[in-house]
Amino acid sequence: MGQDQTKQQIEKGLQLYQSNQTEKALQVWTKVLEKSSDLMGRFRVLGCLVTAHSEMGRYKEMLKFAVVQIDTARELEDADFLLESYLNLARSNEKLCEFHKTISYCKTCLGLPGTRAGAQLGGQVSLSMGNAFLGLSVFQKALESFEKALRYAHNNDDAMLECRVCCSLGSFYAQVKDYEKALFFPCKAAELVNNYGKGWSLKYRAMSQYHMAVAYRLLGRLGSAMECCEESMKIALQHGDRPLQALCLLCFADIHRSRGDLETAFPRYDSAMSIMTEIGNRLGQVQALLGVAKCWVARKALDKALDAIERAQDLAEEVGNKLSQLKLHCLSESIYRSKGLQRELRAHVVRFHECVEETELYCGLCGESIGEKNSRLQALPCSHIFHLRCLQNNGTRSCPNCRRSSMKPGFV
């Protein structure tokens, strides 16, 4: 298959894909890969296969095609293509919750010589890196990466990238419990979709609605949460977007749990868990198990809650997500306290405080924890976060966290 025919077939696949005939599109692209001798065409079709498998939640397949794409980029001896293929490799690992690998591949991207693609893709590299740091609960570096990605988006008038970064920032602030910002950023993403997104994939609308649903639930606005989640789920079902379907099911389950309707919550947690296990979203499985554990606690079935916590803890440690570990130790602590088991209680108290230290989830000005309850937060230019009230009361010209770490004794 020559260059022109390859190009034709790739376009045919794209048209099928955009009209939701995904399996037919995959067949066309796979045939191109088998028959085409045109390296440029092969590189492009591998990019299409990476994106399609990502949206379907077939992350192991996505990773496989990303690896082949790197080999093709090396054959082409082009730094632009190499950057693009390393970014796809980083994203594949991000989806599989291999966050340390993601960060490593993103650093490889940033270390490549300055290229035309570097200007276009630098923001996406920073976004993927931020998502990976967030997956590891390294909050300062996550925020630093997101802000860098946002600067790329603004400097290049890239509204699509800005939309994705706003969704990630929504997730960031939901985790550190500044619910006002957790809602502000996905609302900003939805506004970008309305203003610029006529020709965009509907997944951007679905993504912003999902993150709005999460924030509304945390704020106790359960009707609005349900409305946004239903809209997101509708698009996810239309497009066969399995990863988003799983997230919506998890959000529905959390909404029903918040309403005290445990009968309805349990099967939704099970469905979310089933899809997340199938696609390999281990962090999503941790969140589903945490929700299940909270349901069992509400029913006073403490041993069943501890079973769910144990499974979640294993996964959270495997993935390296410190915030989930912290939440699980906190829940275990309250269970063992009510059971009157002092030895187990003490062990979880110790681990809980270790996790707080590791995540640096405390305000460097007042010393109180961050992320325990909803409070307004503010980041300094170094991306360390503090209670807004503390910054207003104390006023700070330099970051106390940075000051402290620079004073730590080093090895000479």
Curated annotation (Swiss-Prot):
Membrane topology: Peripheral membrane protein
Result of altering R164C: In CMS11; reduced coclustering with acetylcholine receptor
Intracellular or extracellular location(s): Cell membrane; Postsynaptic cell membrane; Cytoplasm, Cytoskeleton
Sequence positions bearing Phosphoserine: S405
An MF annotation (GO) of this entry: zinc ion binding
BP terms from Gene Ontology: chemical synaptic transmission; establishment of protein localization to postsynaptic membrane; motor neuron apoptotic process; neurotransmitter receptor localization to postsynaptic specialization membrane; positive regulation of motor neuron apoptotic process; positive regulation of neuromuscular synaptic transmission; regulation of postsynaptic membrane organization; skeletal muscle acetylcholine-gated channel clustering
Protein modification: Ubiquitinated by the BCR(KLHL8) complex, leading to its degradation.
Annotated zinc fingers (RING-type), start-end: 363-403
Phenotypic consequence of V45M: In CMS11; reduced coclustering with acetylcholine receptor
InterPro entries given in the database record: Postsynaptic, Postsynaptic_CS, RAPsyn, Rapsyn_myristoylation/link_N, TPR-like_helical_dom_sf, TPR_rpt, Znf_RING, Znf_RING/FYVE/PHD
UniProt KW keywords: Cell membrane, Congenital myasthenic syndrome, Cytoplasm, Cytoskeleton, Disease variant, Lipoprotein, Membrane, Metal-binding, Myristate, Phosphoprotein, Postsynaptic cell membrane, Repeat, Synapse, TPR repeat, Ubl conjugation, Zinc, Zinc-finger
TPR repeats: 6-39, 83-116, 123-156, 163-196, 206-239, 246-279, 286-319
Keyword Ribonucleoprotein in record: no
Modified residues (Phosphotyrosine): Y196
Chief place where the protein resides: membrane
Superkingdom assignment: Eukaryota
An example Gene Ontology CC term for this record: neuromuscular junction
Lipid group attachment sites (N-myristoyl glycine): G2
Coiled coil: none
Known disease link: Myasthenic syndrome, congenital, 11, associated with acetylcholine receptor deficiency: A form of congenital myasthenic syndrome, a group of disorders characterized by failure of neuromuscular transmission, including pre-synaptic, synaptic, and post-synaptic disorders that are not of autoimmune origin. Clinical features are easy fatigability and muscle weakness affecting the axial and limb muscles (with hypotonia in early-onset forms), the ocular muscles (leading to ptosis and ophthalmoplegia), and the facial and bulbar musculature (affecting sucking and swallowing, and leading to dysphonia). Fetal akinesia deformation sequence 2: A clinically and genetically heterogeneous group of disorders with congenital malformations related to impaired fetal movement. Clinical features include fetal akinesia, intrauterine growth retardation, polyhydramnios, arthrogryposis, pulmonary hypoplasia, craniofacial abnormalities, and cryptorchidism. FADS2 inheritance is autosomal recessive.
Family as reported in the entry's similarity comment: Belongs to the RAPsyn family.
Function: Postsynaptic protein required for clustering of nicotinic acetylcholine receptors (nAChRs) at the neuromuscular junction. It may link the receptor to the underlying postsynaptic cytoskeleton, possibly by direct association with actin or spectrin.
Free-text comment about domains: A cysteine-rich region homologous to part of the regulatory domain of protein kinase C may be important in interactions of this protein with the lipid bilayer.
Protein name: 43 kDa receptor-associated protein of the synapse
UniProt source species: Homo sapiens (Human)
Gene: RAPSN
